[in-house]
Each structure stands twice: as structure tokens, then as C-alpha cells.
Design a protein with these regions (language model features):
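Polybasic, lysine-rich low-complexity intrinsically disordered segments
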Residues: 2-3, 13
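Cross-family detector of peptidyl-prolyl cis-trans isomerase
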Residues: 37-199
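C-terminal motif of bacterial Sec signal peptides marking the signal peptidase cleavage site
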Residues: 32-35
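Hydrophobic helical h-region of N-terminal Sec-dependent signal peptides
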Residues: 25-30
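Bacterial N-terminal signal peptides that target proteins for export
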Residues: 10-24
Length: 199
């Protein structure tokens, strides 16, 4: 069995019981490849030390934040752009909305960076709440690896620890359903960006 881990970005739109919250986050994504040779013997690759993987991941996250900036539209959709000589911008690492939270996992303290672009006006979800969310996941090369353009329900206790820790930092918003079209619109929701190392 071979395990390859990489960090990714997730764009989230969070709606809790008709109230919404958007987040953009970096989510670990693990590819697991299992193969058996023709002689039916198996080989396994020993898992790497947790601290070594974390140190590599956090260095990659911090490098990304030092070399990219964000553009945010009126709906809190975020675009990441690499800083170059012809494309200047304020690095994410210098963004005034940048915060971090430290959690311990596997005996290693993990730094979870997040940008709080809008706090929201409603209630904060807890780690045990069910949330209604859409998202868009990016690899560190900015290619999209997963997306749910329409919101889906999931339990925060069933997702990665990073989501459980950062979702409660934001609040839900307000919603309005047009009785003629039955279309629900959301406003004043929490919105942000989250960066989560593997593990």
C-alpha cells in the first residue's frame, strides 16, 4: 500500500437550517493506492512519522501564503493568484483577516490558518452540528479536485478535525425564500478561507 498526502483548498458555502456560512479552506486529501503483485505477496510502505509530515505540510502552506494573494467578490467567492513581477499583490500571510488556531493531533500541535472575511450574523455551529454546505476543493497547484456547487448536508463530527475546529469560528447568516419562485437567497453569512495540514 502506498499513501501519498497533499494539501488542498476547499471553498465552502455553509448553510445551517436555512442559514448560510461560506468558507474556503485547505483540506488534506489522501490518495491510497493498493496493488498486489502477480505472486500474491504484498509489500507495505511504513507510515512516515507524523511530525515529519506535518513539518513538510506547514512549510508548503506557509510558502503558498507567502507567494499568493486573494481577490474576493461580493459573494465572498475567493480567487487565488500567484505573486509575480507582473502580478503584484499583498501575500495571504500579510492579510489583515489572517488568524490561526492550534490543535493537537497524534501528539503533534497543528497550526490551522484561516482568513475570516466575514463573521456572519447568526449562531455559530458546534462540532456536533449538521451543516448544509457547498464547496470547491483545490490542490496547491490550484487545480480543482472536488466540488459541490449545490449545498449538501454533513455532520461536522464526521469530517476532518480542521473543519470541526474552524467552522465554529464563523456564524450563519440569514435566508429568504421567494414564494413565487421558491428560490432561497442567503446573506450576511460567515465567509473565509481555511488552510489545514494533513493529519
Amino acid at each position: 500500500m502506498k499513501i501519498v498526502s497533499c494539501e488542498h483548498f476547499f471553498k465552502l458555502k455553509y448553510y445551517k437550517m436555512k442559514l448560510s456560512l461560506r468558507l474556503l479552506l485547505l483540506l488534506p486529501f489522501i490518495f491510497v493506492m493498493v496493488g498486489c503483485p502477480n505472486d500474491d505477496t504484498t509489500t507495505t510502505t511504513e507510515a512516515r512519522p507524523y511530525l515529519d509530515v506535518y513539518n513538510e505540510d506547514i512549510a508548503e502552506i506557509e510558502d503558498f501564503m507567502d507567494t499568493h494573494f486573494i481577490t474576493v467578490d461580493g459573494d465572498y467567492n475567493v480567487t487565488f493568484t500567484e505573486i509575480t513581477g507582473t502580478t503584484p499583490g499583498t501575500p495571504i500571510s500579510d492579510h489583515p483577516a489572517l488568524n490561526f488556531k492550534t490543535i493537537s493531533k497524534g501528539g503533534v500541535d497543528h497550526k490551522l490558518y484561516y482568513l475570516k472575511l466575514n463573521e456572519g450574523v447568526g449562531s455559530n455551529p458546534t462540532k456536533l452540528d449538521s451543516v448544509f454546505s457547498s464547496y470547491k476543493g483545490y490542490k496547491t497547484d490550484l487545480s480543482v479536485f472536488d466540488a459541490a456547487s449545490n449545498p449538501i448536508w454533513f455532520q461536522l463530527e464526521d469530517v476532518i478535525d480542521g473543519w470541526q475546529e474552524i467552522f465554529p469560528e464563523f456564524k450563519s447568516g440569514t435566508s429568504f425564500t421567494d414564494s413565487d419562485t421558491n428560490v432561497t437567497t442567503y446573506s450576511d453569512f460567515g465567509a473565509g478561507v481555511m488552510f489545514v495540514p494533513s493529519g
